Amino acid sequence: MAAEEGKDEAGLDQVEEEFSIWKRNTPFLYDLMISHPLEWPSLTLHWVPSTPIPYSKDPYFAVHKLILGTHTSGGAQDFLMVADVVIPTPDAEPGLGGRDQEPIVPKVEIKQKIRVDGEVNRARCMPQKPTLVGAKTSGSEVFLFDYARLSGKPQTSECDPDLRLMGHEQEGYGLAWSSFKEGYLLSGSQDQRICLWDVSATATDKVLNPMHVYEGHQSIIEDVAWHMKNENIFGSAGDDCQLVIWDLRTNQMQHQVKVHEREINYLSFNPFNEWVLATASSDSTVALFDLRKLTAPLHVLSKHEGEVFQVEWDPNHETVLASSGEDRRLMVWDINRVGDEQLEIELDAEDGPPELLFSHGGHKAKISDFAWNKDEPWVISSVAEDNSLQVWQMAESIYREDDEDEDDDDEGNQNAQHSNENQK
């Protein structure tokens, strides 16, 4: 027992030491770094997909919105939360003050709290109506809230969603809105089911049943995701190590492949390339796949220590993606760099493979969720079990060279495409 306590203390000391080193290096590693302590940890995080508005005190800053939740473990009432994030625009000049000549500091402010039953496992906004939020909690229902409708109204102690979406028997985390079909919401849970609702359909007493239930997984479904180019295709993944591709036109599986030896926790379709997707697994890797050949990965990204819980493609750069795991690290990868030579062999090998662009070490506990900001390239928000919410952007010097290379590649690809078309 004493040995275990000593081991725990040593682990905590190591976390504090690593955090201290990270903090000292922050000015050199980041162009933007906001760290905001939350009253309760949030398991979920999502940028509201609406146009940022100019900040009233300084036109060189803009207000972005974030959706968060609370994870109180029964210690208090739980809420879905809307936050304002004030960050500089790309045109902002360093040290620029507001109208009162006081320097404007990037910040996060919780603006709205909406009562929910149970902890918020995951919350996501409808792309076509950004104020409409789907929320999966520690119960089996999925709640739908229009936070604009509730804005300005007194906060109640009752959970009063616009809709209660039924169909699951257990809680879960998988939740995804279709960017093509307005109102289509997918959910995957521990009951091994995937439910699909059309929230624009007529509900009875604010209760809506699924338009279809998909079954085929043999264990907990960890995640669901829509294809980014084909409105009829979606994917699911779970603890049975299976990646499943489904087609709405037949409501059948297109592919079912065991792609990892341990649980698959997340999947993400590339927003630019219709064939490429990524999976995050408890085997400590992120794997990249071609939909035309799922039997073997295109490439495996390895640097995390422990389970990898999330992977998300950058909405602004085709070859860039990020992943997070139980090692408290959020890693940004650029697959354009796969195979690059490493000059300082020993030093570079310690830093990781050449495709590892950046490793964010600002959290002291497991990262629960993170999100790319589509309106501000290279800006990421992340939340962790240590109650921290961080909004950050790596230093331009880290990615600039890669941006230039990507522009050259894009031009080359376009020329090649024109050449192919001419040959046809």
UniProtKB/Swiss-Prot annotation:
Localisation: Nucleus
WD repeats: 167-207, 216-256, 259-299, 303-343, 362-402
Keyword Ion transport part of the UniProt annotation: no
Biased composition regions of type Polar residues, renumbered to the chain: 413-424
One BP term from GO: chromatin organization
Residues found modified as N-acetylmethionine: M1
Pfam family, one: CAF1C_H4-bd
Region described as Disordered: 394-424
Chain span(s) of sequence motif DWD box: 233-249
InterPro entries: G-protein_beta_WD-40_rep, Histone-bd_RBBP4-like_N, WD40/YVTN_repeat-like_dom_sf, WD40_repeat_CS, WD40_repeat_dom_sf, WD40_rpt, WD_repeat_RBAP46/RBAP48/MSI1
Domain notes: The DWD box is required for interaction with DDB1A.
Described purpose of this protein according to its UniProt entry: Core histone-binding subunit that may target chromatin assembly factors, chromatin remodeling factors and histone deacetylases to their histone substrates in a manner that is regulated by nucleosomal DNA.
Protein name: WD-40 repeat-containing protein MSI3
Organism this protein belongs to: Arabidopsis thaliana
